[in-house]
Swiss-Prot record:
Subunit structure: Component of the Mediator complex.
Region: Disordered, residue numbers: 1-55
Superkingdom of source: Eukaryota
Cited PANTHER family: MEDIATOR OF RNA POLYMERASE II TRANSCRIPTION SUBUNIT 7
Protein name: Mediator of RNA polymerase II transcription subunit 7
Family indicated by similarity: Belongs to the Mediator complex subunit 7 family.
Biological process annotations from GO: regulation of transcription by RNA polymerase II
Bias-annotated ranges (Basic and acidic residues): 24-46
Species the sequence originates in: Aspergillus terreus (strain NIH 2624 / FGSC A1156)
Upper lineage: Eukaryota, Fungi, Dikarya, Ascomycota, Pezizomycotina
InterPro entries: Med7/Med21-like (IPR037212), Mediatior_Med7 (IPR009244), Mediatior_Med7_sf (IPR044888)
Matching Pfam families: Med7
Cellular compartments annotated: Nucleus
Gene Ontology CC terms: core mediator complex; mediator complex
Main location: nucleus
């Protein structure tokens, strides 16, 4: 009975934690920290700060009840289990045929085997088949409502048809994911480029305003260059940052005085 109830418990929306959580007690955590501190001691007998990897922790002589506290290695290939369902680590989108599901639209010409590669192939019109599947969903839903009103016990076939249509539509949408990622990247780069151009325009505008202000002061007989040199000598900046700051302050003072 316990074995038969385990799969259903794992597939629930809020699955219970695995049984190993019972080993995560304050006493066991403290014991593990003491073992790690003892193993990290140097030649002088003092513990050193060390970041332990799961492999290094498993290499320690730990009692069975403490081995559950060691995190497992991160899987790099194959599958992993989540709530009793196997999930693949591969990022490639599996075909519906590989998943044992009926495909309601033609495969992409590039995926067909035995095709003459010398002839150019027409791309698959995803939008056309998405529209067809959407219309089929509406029709099958109306038929499903009719079946429920006449013969409710025969609902299962229509539910399977609706499920298959939804899966095909979802799979077609997932085929757009690489295109969506490229378009999102293009949009982000265009925004950054536009922001950089705007900042450059603002700096050019400010430079033009400062140049015009200095020219007006020169036309009024103000020796701007001498005033700037005298101010720099009086301040005697000791660092490059101080020189830049003093020069900027002088420019703003000239602009304020002109206004």
């Amino acid at each position: 009975m316990a074995e038969s109830g385990q799969p259903s418990a794992l597939t629930t929306a809020f699955a219970p934690p695995p049984p190993l959580w019972k080993h995560f007690t304050p006493e066991n955590v403290k014991r593990l920290e003491e073992i790690k501190k003892e193993a990290s001691k140097g030649e002088d007998g003092k513990p050193r700060k060390k970041t332990w990897t799961p492999a290094e922790l498993r290499a320690l002589d730990l009692p069975p009840e403490l081995r559950f506290l060691v995190p497992p290695e991160v899987p790099t290939e194959g599958h992993y289990s989540v709530f009793g369902e196997l999930q693949s680590l591969s990022t490639a989108l599996p075909s519906l045929k590989d998943q044992g599901i009926e495909q309601l639209y033609p495969s992409s010409p590039a995926a067909e085997s035995g095709r003459d590669t010398s002839e150019p192939s027409k791309p698959l019109n995803h939008a056309y088949y998405l529209l067809k599947i959407s219309k089929s969903l509406l029709l099958n839903f109306l038929e499903f409502v009719g079946v429920l009103s006449i013969c409710p016990e025969q609902f299962e076939s229509k539910v399977n048809d609706l499920r298959n249509l939804f899966i095909n539509a979802h799979h077609l949408l997932n085929l757009y994911r690489p295109h969506q990622a490229r378009e999102s990247l293009i949009m982000m780069m265009e925004e950054q480029l536009s922001q950089s151009r705007e900042e450059i325009q603002q700096m050019d505008k400010l430079k033009a305003e400062i140049t015009d202000a200095l020219d007006r002061l020169r036309r009024q007989g103000v020796d701007v260059d001498s005033a700037a040199g005298a101010a720099v000598q009086e301040e005697k900046p000791t660092t490059a940052e101080a020189q830049i700051s003093d020069h900027s302050r002088l420019v703003w003072d000239l602009l304020d005085g002109d206004n």
